[in-house]
Amino acid sequence: SSAASDVYKRQEHPEENIERIIYRSLRVKKNVVENDEHEQGQRACLNFGHTIGHGIEAVKGVRGRRTNGLFHGECVALGMLPMIEDKSLVRRTRAIYRTLGLPTRTGVDKNKVLSYMQHDKKSTGSTITVIKVPGLGCWRADKIPMTELPALLGIKENED
């Protein structure tokens, strides 16, 4: 959508627009929560990045409690990257992270993240629900087999 594109263009120079970006983001989140108070539909989009993000957070630790830890938002931001299916959008998102001084790599053992994710509250035994973004301004909730998690995390089949 053109509205999503405008927001994204503004975020490519976040230092010039940070207050507007934060205000608009909070307004959007508030509307989503108010329109889906019981998490029956649209509110699921707010889980974008959290499934992998919580795994990163569990392994890396939270800044303040662990010296080299990351903030919750940094973990979620890193967890968003593998969920973006459009590679050019991944590159643009990484560029924005760099501009904001956010990490673009986790620096953690992906197998440890995988192990944590296999016990995530959004998992139901052999499947887990993740939020994927096929392109700018659109998302979908996917129930994927746990066996797809290694590939999603970029773990090679024979990697230990």
Go through the PLM ranges and name each one.
Residues 1-8:
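Short, small-residue-biased leader/transition segments that mark boundaries at the very start
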Residues 4, 42, 125-127:
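A structure-centric signal for secondary-structure junctions around beta-strands
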Residues 9-10, 36, 139, 145:
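Short, solvent-exposed coil/turn linker segments
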Residues 10-111:
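Active-site segments that bind and position negatively charged phosphate/pyrophosphate groups
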Residues 91-160:
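C-terminal charged capping/lid subdomain of soluble metabolic enzymes
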